[in-house]
Design a protein with these regions (language model features):
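Ser/Thr-rich, Pro/Gly/Ala-heavy low-complexity intrinsically disordered linkers and tails
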Residues: 25-47
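N-terminal cap/lid segment of alpha/beta-hydrolase-fold proteins
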Residues: 47-98
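Short beta-strand element of the alpha/beta-hydrolase
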Residues: 100-110
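Short amphipathic alpha-helix adjacent to the substrate-entry channel of hydrolases
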Residues: 118-138
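Alpha/beta-hydrolase active-site loop
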Residues: 154-192
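Primarily recognizes the serine-hydrolase "nucleophile elbow" in alpha/beta-hydrolase
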Residues: 178, 182-266
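Short beta-strand/loop motif that positions the catalytic acidic residue
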Residues: 281-283, 287
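C-terminal catalytic histidine-bearing segment of alpha/beta-hydrolase fold enzymes
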Residues: 296-299, 303-349
Length: 349
């Protein structure tokens, strides 16, 4: 995937945030990320607008709930009777913020079997960013109990490679990723309504949500979009397939790489390349749910491609460490500093 011409630890743009967390971002590494996007420039990009965000909480936050598309629910994986379900998101808007706003896509965890867009920690992130000028969406997606539509190749892979006890969770990876991309496409489709600059979209998650954020930052445009036809799943027509699902930065909290491993197993091709979105990796070294080795594997992939990353191991910390600090910075402060630096946003006092 490709991102605008931002430098990995670029020494440009406003530094007020980095002054507070300079030690936190000292581990950032990488090379310049090439420009380009198969979807072409957005209207805001064509106008040359760079988003202006605020140093402190400034804007009142208005929240609302929207349906971003539909998906099929099956009575059995790979078949059975079907019924459409609405896919929902909560939208957070900064009242009075200037147009050309950046956006943050927030994705909940829960092992692909539970969790909700209304999780308190996620709402905290949404309100923190929105009060400073971002438009945020916190999304729901199909889970194991929904048994979303699967491509035939995924069904065969699961039968051949995954133990029966794990097949339900592994199967849920596909519709969850498809839904996450649909939510980003909804943002693009509604960019004018919410005054967005879609050249500045970030994806952030926790646990399973970070699996999906990494998918958004690394996979190719056709992945989790073209494997299923509209004749197999008529609800695809509701998911803005004419829009891109590109994100420019990823914030990973204790996520993993299983989607990418399955894609590579299916076609023999790694999705990591020098156009991937820069990533901030936060992961507890004592995580017993998603092993710390997943963070190390993600870092190794970014080292190999030369794309910018920051690596923040939480020593002795387990899974879901939302209250952790790094160099005295909260996870919200850590994330916003990384986004501002990577995207070279303009910061207003």
């Amino acid at each position: 995937m490709t991102a605008p011409g931002w430098s990995g630890c670029a020494r440009r743009g406003r530094r007020w945030w980095l002054a507070a967390v300079v030690a936190v971002l000292a581990g950032c590494d990488g090379a310049e990320v090439p420009a380009g996007d198969d979807a072409g420039p957005s209207d805001a990009d064509a106008a040359g607008a760079v988003p202006v965000v605020r140093r402190t909480a400034t804007y009142p936050v208005l929240s609302s709930t929207h349906v971003y598309g539909q998906g099929l629910r099956h009575s059995a994986w790979g078949g059975g009777t079907t019924s459409p379900i609405d896919l929902q998101l909560d939208l957070f808007e900064p009242q009075g913020a200037p147009a050309g706003r950046p956006a943050l896509v927030i994705i909940h965890g829960g092992g692909f079997s539970g969790g909700s867009r209304t999780q308190a920690e996620l709402r905290s992130f949404a309100e923190y960013f929105t009060a400073r000028g971002w438009v945020c969406i916190s999304i729901d997606y199909r889970l194991t109990g929904d048994r979303g539509t699967l491509p035939a190749r995924w069904v065969q892979y699961l039968e051949d490679q995954v133990p029966p006890s794990s097949q339900g969770q592994a199967a849920a990876l596909y519709p969850a990723a498809r839904d996450a991309k649909a939510a980003v496409r909804w943002l693009y489709a509604n960019a004018s309504t919410y005054q967005l600059n879609t050249d500045y979209v970030t994806a952030m998650g926790g646990s399973a949500g970070s699996y999906l954020a990494i998918v958004l930052g690394v996979t190719d445009p056709q992945d989790f979009r073209d494997e299923v036809s509209a004749s197999e799943d008529p609800t695809l027509a509701s998911t803005h397939l004419d829009q891109p699902a590109r994100v420019r930065t990823v914030i990973d909290h204790w996520g993993g790489l299983e989607h990418l491993r399955i894609l590579e197993a299916l076609d023999g091709r790694s999705r990591f390349d020098d156009g991937d979105a820069p990533v901030s990796i936060v992961h507890g070294t004592a995580d017993a749910t998603v092993p710390f080795t997943e963070a190390e594997a993600l870092r190794a992939a970014y080292v190999a491609t030369g794309v910018a990353y920051a690596f923040h191991p939480l020593e002795g910390v387990g899974h879901g460490a939302w209250t952790a600090t790094v160099g005295g910075a909260t996870l919200e402060e850590l994330a916003i500093a990384f986004v501002i630096e990577q995207q070279a946003l303009v910061v207003s006092e």
